[in-house]
Amino acid sequence: MATSEEPSTDASIICYAPSMITTNGVWQGDNPLDFSLPLFVLQLTLVVVVTRFFVFILKPFRQPRVISEILGGIVLGPSVLGRSTKFAHTIFPQRSVMVLETMANVGLLYFLFLVGVEMDIMVVRKTGKRALTIAIGGMVLPFLIGAAFSFSMHRSEDHLGQGTYILFLGVALSVTAFPVLARILAELKLINTEIGRISMSAALVNDMFAWILLALAIALAESDKTSFASLWVMISSAVFIAVCVFVVRPGIAWIIRKTPEGENFSEFHICLILTGVMISGFITDAIGTHSVFGAFVFGLVIPNGPLGLTLIEKLEDFVSGLLLPLFFAISGLKTNIAAIQGPATWLTLFLVIFLACAGKVIGTVIVAFFHGMPVREGITLGLLLNTKGLVEMIVLNVGKDQKVLDDETFATMVLVALVMTGVITPIVTILYKPVKKSVSYKRRTIQQTKPDSELRVLVCVHTPRNVPTIINLLEASHPTKRSPICIYVLHLVELTGRASAMLIVHNTRKSGRPALNRTQAQSDHIINAFENYEQHAAFVAVQPLTAISPYSTMHEDVCSLAEDKRVSFIIIPFHKQQTVDGGMESTNPAYRLVNQNLLENSPCSVGILVDRGLNGATRLNSNTVSLQVAVLFFGGPDDREALAYAWRMAQHPGITLTVLRFIHDEDEADTASTRATNDSDLKIPKMDHRKQRQLDDDYINLFRAENAEYESIVYIEKLVSNGEETVAAVRSMDSSHDLFIVGRGEGMSSPLTAGLTDWSECPELGAIGDLLASSDFAATVSVLVVQQYVGSWAQEDDMDFPESPVHSHETKVTYGLENPR
């Protein structure tokens, strides 16, 4: 037990009871908090809960998770809750700090190992002169400012020299946190911009310099007894790095070669590597460098590829979500804001924040100016490089442990890191607004696209499972020399707190290097599939892209890209997939949110693809494509857009198209679509329904006239009285087709679909689309639900209908009129 529960000083003596680890239980009269294990479990739970609370509170402000973790530590420490003596002595007694700090450092050890695994040294080598000079320019001035302030903050009675103090403050102020910066860039949707790429590359270079300076600072701090100790520390560190590069790396490469491709690595090899992390930490700690340095270097020598991916997947969530917050909690327990006393000290704090931030901005602006960048972009770049995070906290904690930094300086620098990182997102949001070019183009629908012009399609993909059906659908879209297809493939990646998801920005696929993480591996698989399609198909151009966003705002990236690229049609997968027994199950409910938001905000037409086996019906070779396609036409702009797309597909020699138009058999007035009852909830303008009926008739007549000679195109009119007869008619043809193309029918109400919406599970598909996609539908038929761009409706009145596409084969059209009664 502890003989002293006062705040730690050099004279404190803490006594431990080694056998008091687990309790006999409260029924035996034991207090669980007197024993190490239950106390640690309570502390860990409290740290995670408080940290997650701040993550939830700060999420609307788009703050990185490191802010929440530092705030959680400060709240639990002597600055807030720790001011209560009872709380401090009960929850965080000094006798428990050793266990807590040991576990925190174990978590830190493995986290830095993962950072090393994910970091690609080749990217640093290929950053270019601009990123390198920007990184150096952004480090020099803050380092000099830290050195200048060290003279006023360093106490003459401290046992360590001024040089060591300068080094610690300089490193703390000049570093940039690469993982935190990646998160901020993704939140601000700058990660794929030029300024995002430059700042990420500069941050990587900065990170490498920071590790070198950190090793030097630790060596100087831990070797004050003899002047040659620092030299031996540096030599030993160099030898350790050489052993890792020339001995450990080849050994791990041998393990990778011995493991057959596609098979899992053995448990023995994984445990061997995880043990190697601890051994590396022990060695570097023993030679006078911090243990995290050894873990980081050990991670760097792990070859990129499946082994690195396996290690990341096994460790990252546990280490980042559970153990790493302990490190920030320890930092918070060491942070006593009350130690910052007097107006002069607070003035120094604000001066350090302002001048350090200004120094990095000025240094970056000067270098950026010489590279021809606008001043506003240089300022934004400088602000982004002010991001602080884990490396700075390591520097500060080492400085505190080595008595280089006193309580006042430590608390000051923690607040500096907190404020400098916290203000970046709002300031950059206000200051830097990328110039959005006003894009004005008329061909926002397939119906408006001329048959002799390029069709631009944006394909959204969540997982590789979406790829085969989409590729087959695109091949069926019949790209020709006269009307080629330009495909923008957008891999949609959720923005998470995991660093590995961020590193996809530095995709090294083109250099032939393997994927760094599962996200990049999936992206590579998707892109390779589409590029393979491009190579084997004629008149197709593919451009792969990646969007990293929260699902709540992912549609903004899709809409922005569609407008920038002047896209006419967006294809996005349905949120449900087919199961083995033929049913439909949801893969990720967030996909549905993306689809709904996209339908509401899209700048062009949208198609939601329900995949129920289309991938088994076609091949990449256009000569072997064979599809039976059906269009169910009820009327309205969405149905006309569906027919326009099917019309294009019908020109493919392997496509047979059936157009089934449903007509009410009582009164022509009833066939006109009427407004839905909830007018206020609909986004579409009030339409002249007779005009819409006229547009339907005109387009159908044009379609029939242009295709009268082609027997692969069948047109049928079916008279029905109500929704029940409509369902019966649809079910009668479900087994003879591979793909249904239907309009969503947004804002339209018809007696032909009366009652169908009452049982609708997915309103975003419309009444007919929901029926076809439901698990109750007998056949495994894929469905494409089309919504025409809203703004095109007003233009249709004055629009000439497009010429019919050029046909390459002579066939004959079949007409029919059916009454089911």
Curated annotation (Swiss-Prot):
Gene3D superfamilies: 1.20.1530.20, 3.40.50.12370. May operate as a cation/H(+) antiporter. Specifically expressed in pollen. This is Cation/H(+) antiporter 15. It is a multi-pass membrane protein. One of its GO terms (cellular component) is membrane. It comes from the Eukaryota. GO terms for biological process: potassium ion transport; proton transmembrane transport; regulation of pH. Belongs to the monovalent cation:proton antiporter 2 (CPA2) transporter (TC 2.A.37) family. CHX (TC 2.A.37.4) subfamily. InterPro entries: Cation/H_exchanger_TM, CPA2_transporter, Na+/solute_symporter_sf. It holds the Pfam family Na_H_Exchanger. The keyword Ribonucleoprotein does not apply. Residues 800-821 are annotated as: Disordered. The keyword Ion transport applies. It is found in: Membrane. Keywords: Antiport, Ion transport, Membrane, Potassium, Potassium transport, Transmembrane, Transmembrane helix, Transport. One of its GO terms (molecular function) is antiporter activity. The chain crosses the membrane at residues 37-57, 65-82, 97-117, 131-151, 166-186, 200-220, 228-248, 268-288, 292-312, 318-338, 350-370, 378-398, 410-430. It comes from Arabidopsis thaliana.
